[in-house]
Amino acid sequence: MSLVTSLTYVLPHRLLSSLARALAYSKSPATKQWLIDTVTRKFGVDLSEAQEPDPRVYPTFNAFFTRALKPGARVPDADPQALLMPADGRISQLGPIENGRIFQAKGQSFTAAELLGDESAAVPFHNGLFATVYLSPKDYHRVHMPWSGTLRETVHVPGRLFSVGPDAVRNVPRLFARNERLVCHFDTDFGPMASVMVGALLVSGVETVWSGVEIPRYGDRITRKDYRGKGITLERFAEMARFNYGSTVIVLLPPGVAALEGGLAAESSVRLGQALARRQVA
Protein backbone atom coordinates (compact mmCIF):
# COMPACT_ATOMS: atom_id res chain seq x y z
CA MET A 1 0.00 0.00 0.00
CA SER A 2 1.40 3.40 -0.95
CA LEU A 3 1.94 6.17 1.58
CA VAL A 4 -0.81 8.24 -0.08
CA THR A 5 -3.34 5.41 0.25
CA SER A 6 -2.30 4.83 3.87
CA LEU A 7 -2.81 8.52 4.62
CA THR A 8 -6.34 8.47 3.21
CA TYR A 9 -7.43 6.48 6.26
CA VAL A 10 -6.64 9.45 8.51
CA LEU A 11 -7.02 12.46 6.23
CA PRO A 12 -10.09 14.70 6.74
CA HIS A 13 -11.92 13.59 3.59
CA ARG A 14 -14.79 16.06 3.82
CA LEU A 15 -12.60 19.05 4.57
CA LEU A 16 -10.23 18.31 1.70
CA SER A 17 -13.10 17.75 -0.73
CA SER A 18 -14.78 20.98 0.41
CA LEU A 19 -11.54 22.86 -0.22
CA ALA A 20 -11.28 21.21 -3.63
CA ARG A 21 -14.82 22.35 -4.41
CA ALA A 22 -14.02 25.94 -3.43
CA LEU A 23 -10.97 25.95 -5.68
CA ALA A 24 -12.82 24.25 -8.55
CA TYR A 25 -15.48 26.97 -8.59
CA SER A 26 -13.13 29.90 -7.96
CA LYS A 27 -13.41 32.63 -10.59
CA SER A 28 -10.06 34.11 -9.67
CA PRO A 29 -8.23 34.26 -13.03
CA ALA A 30 -4.89 33.43 -11.43
CA THR A 31 -6.25 30.52 -9.37
CA LYS A 32 -8.28 28.85 -12.10
CA GLN A 33 -5.52 29.23 -14.69
CA TRP A 34 -2.88 27.81 -12.35
CA LEU A 35 -5.12 24.80 -11.68
CA ILE A 36 -5.86 24.25 -15.36
CA ASP A 37 -2.22 24.56 -16.37
CA THR A 38 -1.04 22.28 -13.56
CA VAL A 39 -3.53 19.50 -14.30
CA THR A 40 -3.01 19.76 -18.06
CA ARG A 41 0.75 19.44 -17.66
CA LYS A 42 0.76 16.78 -14.92
CA PHE A 43 -1.81 14.44 -16.48
CA GLY A 44 -1.32 15.16 -20.18
CA VAL A 45 -4.83 16.47 -20.85
CA ASP A 46 -5.61 16.53 -24.58
CA LEU A 47 -7.76 19.53 -25.47
CA SER A 48 -7.77 18.89 -29.21
CA GLU A 49 -11.10 17.03 -28.90
CA ALA A 50 -12.70 19.64 -26.64
CA GLN A 51 -15.49 21.82 -27.96
CA GLU A 52 -13.46 24.71 -26.54
CA PRO A 53 -9.75 23.90 -26.98
CA ASP A 54 -8.45 27.19 -25.50
CA PRO A 55 -7.82 26.60 -21.77
CA ARG A 56 -7.91 30.35 -21.08
CA VAL A 57 -11.58 30.63 -22.04
CA TYR A 58 -12.97 28.48 -19.21
CA PRO A 59 -14.37 30.67 -16.39
CA THR A 60 -13.53 28.14 -13.66
CA PHE A 61 -11.47 25.00 -13.22
CA ASN A 62 -14.71 23.03 -12.92
CA ALA A 63 -15.89 24.33 -16.30
CA PHE A 64 -12.59 23.13 -17.78
CA PHE A 65 -12.82 19.79 -16.06
CA THR A 66 -16.37 19.04 -17.18
CA ARG A 67 -15.74 20.34 -20.69
CA ALA A 68 -17.83 19.16 -23.62
CA LEU A 69 -16.33 17.34 -26.59
CA LYS A 70 -16.58 18.42 -30.20
CA PRO A 71 -19.57 16.94 -32.04
CA GLY A 72 -18.52 13.59 -33.45
CA ALA A 73 -15.51 13.18 -31.15
CA ARG A 74 -17.26 10.12 -29.72
CA VAL A 75 -19.82 8.03 -31.57
CA PRO A 76 -21.84 5.02 -30.40
CA ASP A 77 -20.99 1.55 -31.69
CA ALA A 78 -22.80 0.98 -34.98
CA ASP A 79 -24.42 -2.24 -33.77
CA PRO A 80 -27.83 -1.26 -32.32
CA GLN A 81 -27.63 -4.30 -30.03
CA ALA A 82 -24.42 -3.05 -28.37
CA LEU A 83 -24.60 -1.72 -24.83
CA LEU A 84 -22.14 1.14 -24.68
CA MET A 85 -19.18 2.04 -22.53
CA PRO A 86 -20.50 4.85 -20.30
CA ALA A 87 -17.32 6.93 -20.17
CA ASP A 88 -13.75 7.45 -21.26
CA GLY A 89 -11.31 5.85 -18.86
CA ARG A 90 -9.84 2.55 -17.85
CA ILE A 91 -11.59 -0.64 -16.83
CA SER A 92 -10.92 -1.33 -13.18
CA GLN A 93 -12.76 -4.67 -13.30
CA LEU A 94 -15.64 -6.30 -15.13
CA GLY A 95 -17.32 -9.67 -15.20
CA PRO A 96 -20.10 -11.72 -13.61
CA ILE A 97 -21.80 -10.86 -10.33
CA GLU A 98 -21.22 -14.23 -8.67
CA ASN A 99 -23.24 -15.09 -5.58
CA GLY A 100 -24.22 -11.45 -5.37
CA ARG A 101 -20.58 -10.31 -5.11
CA ILE A 102 -18.66 -7.83 -7.26
CA PHE A 103 -14.94 -8.33 -7.76
CA GLN A 104 -12.77 -5.32 -6.84
CA ALA A 105 -9.18 -6.61 -6.96
CA LYS A 106 -7.19 -9.67 -5.93
CA GLY A 107 -8.53 -10.70 -2.54
CA GLN A 108 -11.09 -7.87 -2.53
CA SER A 109 -14.82 -7.92 -3.27
CA PHE A 110 -18.08 -6.48 -1.98
CA THR A 111 -21.73 -7.33 -2.37
CA ALA A 112 -24.11 -5.74 -4.83
CA ALA A 113 -26.40 -5.07 -1.86
CA GLU A 114 -23.65 -3.08 -0.12
CA LEU A 115 -22.99 -1.08 -3.27
CA LEU A 116 -26.66 -0.29 -3.92
CA GLY A 117 -27.52 0.25 -0.27
CA ASP A 118 -30.47 -2.14 -0.56
CA GLU A 119 -30.67 -5.94 -0.48
CA SER A 120 -33.90 -6.12 -2.49
CA ALA A 121 -32.55 -3.80 -5.20
CA ALA A 122 -29.54 -6.08 -5.63
CA VAL A 123 -31.51 -9.29 -6.23
CA PRO A 124 -32.28 -8.64 -9.95
CA PHE A 125 -28.55 -8.30 -10.63
CA HIS A 126 -27.44 -11.57 -9.00
CA ASN A 127 -25.59 -13.63 -11.63
CA GLY A 128 -25.68 -10.65 -13.95
CA LEU A 129 -22.78 -8.51 -15.16
CA PHE A 130 -20.87 -5.51 -13.86
CA ALA A 131 -18.30 -3.12 -15.30
CA THR A 132 -16.26 -0.68 -13.22
CA VAL A 133 -14.73 2.22 -15.17
CA TYR A 134 -12.19 4.58 -13.60
CA LEU A 135 -12.03 8.13 -14.96
CA SER A 136 -8.59 9.65 -14.41
CA PRO A 137 -8.04 13.43 -14.19
CA LYS A 138 -7.09 13.58 -17.89
CA ASP A 139 -10.32 11.99 -19.14
CA TYR A 140 -13.59 13.43 -20.42
CA HIS A 141 -15.71 13.58 -17.28
CA ARG A 142 -19.25 13.17 -18.48
CA VAL A 143 -21.02 9.84 -18.05
CA HIS A 144 -23.49 8.61 -20.68
CA MET A 145 -26.18 5.95 -20.96
CA PRO A 146 -25.10 2.42 -21.94
CA TRP A 147 -28.68 1.75 -23.11
CA SER A 148 -31.95 3.65 -23.30
CA GLY A 149 -33.80 3.75 -20.01
CA THR A 150 -36.38 5.55 -17.89
CA LEU A 151 -35.21 6.80 -14.52
CA ARG A 152 -37.03 5.03 -11.69
CA GLU A 153 -35.13 6.05 -8.56
CA THR A 154 -31.91 7.53 -7.27
CA VAL A 155 -30.37 6.50 -3.97
CA HIS A 156 -27.74 8.59 -2.22
CA VAL A 157 -25.59 6.37 -0.02
CA PRO A 158 -23.39 8.34 2.40
CA GLY A 159 -19.87 7.18 3.04
CA ARG A 160 -16.17 7.97 3.05
CA LEU A 161 -14.22 9.65 0.28
CA PHE A 162 -11.21 7.41 -0.22
CA SER A 163 -9.13 7.85 -3.35
CA VAL A 164 -10.30 5.50 -6.12
CA GLY A 165 -6.93 5.30 -7.84
CA PRO A 166 -5.41 1.90 -8.67
CA ASP A 167 -3.42 1.57 -5.43
CA ALA A 168 -6.50 2.28 -3.32
CA VAL A 169 -8.57 -0.21 -5.33
CA ARG A 170 -6.00 -2.91 -4.62
CA ASN A 171 -5.66 -2.16 -0.92
CA VAL A 172 -8.79 -0.58 0.57
CA PRO A 173 -11.31 -3.35 1.37
CA ARG A 174 -14.81 -2.85 -0.12
CA LEU A 175 -13.73 0.55 -1.42
CA PHE A 176 -16.66 1.27 -3.74
CA ALA A 177 -19.16 0.07 -1.14
CA ARG A 178 -17.66 2.45 1.44
CA ASN A 179 -17.35 5.68 -0.53
CA GLU A 180 -20.21 8.12 -0.90
CA ARG A 181 -22.15 7.32 -4.06
CA LEU A 182 -25.26 7.99 -6.11
CA VAL A 183 -27.12 4.93 -7.38
CA CYS A 184 -29.26 5.58 -10.47
CA HIS A 185 -31.87 2.90 -11.22
CA PHE A 186 -33.30 2.74 -14.74
CA ASP A 187 -36.04 0.63 -16.28
CA THR A 188 -35.15 -0.59 -19.77
CA ASP A 189 -36.66 -2.88 -22.36
CA PHE A 190 -34.67 -5.75 -20.85
CA GLY A 191 -35.41 -4.95 -17.20
CA PRO A 192 -33.46 -3.02 -14.56
CA MET A 193 -30.11 -1.33 -15.12
CA ALA A 194 -28.08 0.54 -12.52
CA SER A 195 -25.35 3.14 -12.96
CA VAL A 196 -23.49 3.96 -9.76
CA MET A 197 -21.54 7.21 -9.54
CA VAL A 198 -18.86 6.78 -6.87
CA GLY A 199 -17.45 9.82 -5.10
CA ALA A 200 -13.79 10.07 -4.15
CA LEU A 201 -11.20 12.18 -2.37
CA LEU A 202 -11.06 15.67 -3.92
CA VAL A 203 -14.16 15.05 -6.05
CA SER A 204 -15.99 18.33 -5.62
CA GLY A 205 -19.33 17.05 -6.85
CA VAL A 206 -21.48 14.75 -8.96
CA GLU A 207 -24.21 16.31 -11.11
CA THR A 208 -27.03 14.65 -13.02
CA VAL A 209 -28.81 16.03 -16.07
CA TRP A 210 -32.20 15.75 -14.35
CA SER A 211 -31.42 17.21 -10.92
CA GLY A 212 -28.15 19.12 -10.93
CA VAL A 213 -25.74 18.65 -8.02
CA GLU A 214 -26.37 15.36 -6.16
CA ILE A 215 -23.06 14.96 -4.30
CA PRO A 216 -21.80 16.25 -1.91
CA ARG A 217 -24.56 15.81 0.62
CA TYR A 218 -24.20 15.74 4.36
CA GLY A 219 -25.65 13.36 6.90
CA ASP A 220 -25.39 9.66 7.54
CA ARG A 221 -28.75 8.43 6.25
CA ILE A 222 -29.52 6.83 2.91
CA THR A 223 -31.90 9.08 0.96
CA ARG A 224 -34.07 8.13 -2.01
CA LYS A 225 -35.81 10.07 -4.75
CA ASP A 226 -38.68 8.38 -6.57
CA TYR A 227 -38.89 9.38 -10.24
CA ARG A 228 -41.61 6.97 -11.31
CA GLY A 229 -44.20 8.80 -13.36
CA LYS A 230 -41.87 11.74 -14.05
CA GLY A 231 -41.14 10.55 -17.58
CA ILE A 232 -37.38 11.06 -17.43
CA THR A 233 -36.19 8.88 -20.30
CA LEU A 234 -32.64 9.03 -21.59
CA GLU A 235 -31.64 7.48 -24.88
CA ARG A 236 -28.68 5.20 -25.46
CA PHE A 237 -25.48 7.33 -25.57
CA ALA A 238 -27.18 10.39 -24.01
CA GLU A 239 -25.34 12.23 -21.23
CA MET A 240 -26.67 11.34 -17.77
CA ALA A 241 -24.19 12.84 -15.30
CA ARG A 242 -20.78 14.34 -14.79
CA PHE A 243 -18.00 14.18 -12.23
CA ASN A 244 -16.42 17.41 -11.04
CA TYR A 245 -13.09 15.56 -10.78
CA GLY A 246 -11.91 12.03 -11.54
CA SER A 247 -13.81 9.09 -10.11
CA THR A 248 -15.56 5.84 -10.99
CA VAL A 249 -18.83 4.64 -12.54
CA ILE A 250 -20.12 1.09 -12.08
CA VAL A 251 -22.76 -0.37 -14.42
CA LEU A 252 -24.87 -3.35 -13.31
CA LEU A 253 -26.90 -5.54 -15.69
CA PRO A 254 -29.30 -8.40 -14.91
CA PRO A 255 -28.53 -11.99 -15.99
CA GLY A 256 -29.26 -13.30 -19.46
CA VAL A 257 -29.35 -9.87 -21.08
CA ALA A 258 -25.97 -9.47 -22.73
CA ALA A 259 -22.51 -10.93 -23.20
CA LEU A 260 -19.46 -8.80 -22.47
CA GLU A 261 -17.57 -7.63 -25.52
CA GLY A 262 -14.56 -9.79 -26.32
CA GLY A 263 -11.14 -8.32 -25.63
CA LEU A 264 -12.17 -6.22 -22.64
CA ALA A 265 -10.24 -6.84 -19.43
CA ALA A 266 -9.03 -5.10 -16.30
CA GLU A 267 -6.68 -2.22 -17.12
CA SER A 268 -8.06 -1.87 -20.67
CA SER A 269 -8.26 1.75 -21.82
CA VAL A 270 -11.75 2.48 -23.12
CA ARG A 271 -13.65 5.26 -24.83
CA LEU A 272 -17.19 6.42 -24.44
CA GLY A 273 -19.48 4.77 -26.98
CA GLN A 274 -17.48 1.64 -27.73
CA ALA A 275 -19.22 -1.67 -27.12
CA LEU A 276 -19.31 -2.83 -23.50
CA ALA A 277 -21.59 -5.81 -24.16
CA ARG A 278 -23.96 -7.09 -26.81
CA ARG A 279 -27.57 -8.06 -26.35
CA GLN A 280 -28.40 -11.73 -26.40
CA VAL A 281 -31.37 -11.78 -28.75
CA ALA A 282 -33.32 -15.04 -28.97
From Swiss-Prot:
Q: How does it assemble?
A: Heterodimer of a large membrane-associated beta subunit and a small pyruvoyl-containing alpha subunit.
Could you say which cofactors this protein requires? pyruvate
Q: TM segments?
A: none
- In chain numbering, the residues marked as site (Cleavage (non-hydrolytic)) are G246, S247
Query: What does the entry's cofactor note say about binding and number?
Result: Binds 1 pyruvoyl group covalently per subunit.
Q: What does the record list as GO biological process?
A: phosphatidylethanolamine biosynthetic process
Locate the active site: D88, H144, S247
**Single GO molecular function:** phosphatidylserine decarboxylase activity
Q: Which organism is it from?
A: Xanthomonas campestris pv. campestris (strain ATCC 33913 / DSM 3586 / NCPPB 528 / LMG 568 / P 25)
Keyword terms, alphabetized: Cell membrane, Decarboxylase, Lipid biosynthesis, Lipid metabolism, Lyase, Membrane, Phospholipid biosynthesis, Phospholipid metabolism, Pyruvate, Zymogen
Gene Ontology CC: one annotated term: plasma membrane
Where, if anywhere, are coiled coils annotated?
none
Identify its membrane topology class.
Peripheral membrane protein
The UniProt function text for this chain reads: Catalyzes the formation of phosphatidylethanolamine (PtdEtn) from phosphatidylserine (PtdSer).
Where Pyruvic acid (Ser) occurs, the residues are S247
Q: Pathway it acts in?
A: Phospholipid metabolism; phosphatidylethanolamine biosynthesis; phosphatidylethanolamine from CDP-diacylglycerol: step 2/2
Catalytic activity reported: a 1,2-diacyl-sn-glycero-3-phospho-L-serine + H(+) = a 1,2-diacyl-sn-glycero-3-phosphoethanolamine + CO2
Its name, as the record gives it, is: Phosphatidylserine decarboxylase proenzyme
Record PTM: Is synthesized initially as an inactive proenzyme. Formation of the active enzyme involves a self-maturation process in which the active site pyruvoyl group is generated from an internal serine residue via an autocatalytic post-translational modification. Two non-identical subunits are generated from the proenzyme in this reaction, and the pyruvate is formed at the N-terminus of the alpha chain, which is derived from the carboxyl end of the proenzyme.
InterPro entries per the UniProt record, alphabetical = PS_Dcarbxylase, PSD-B, PSD_type1_pro
Q: Where in the cell is it found?
A: Cell membrane
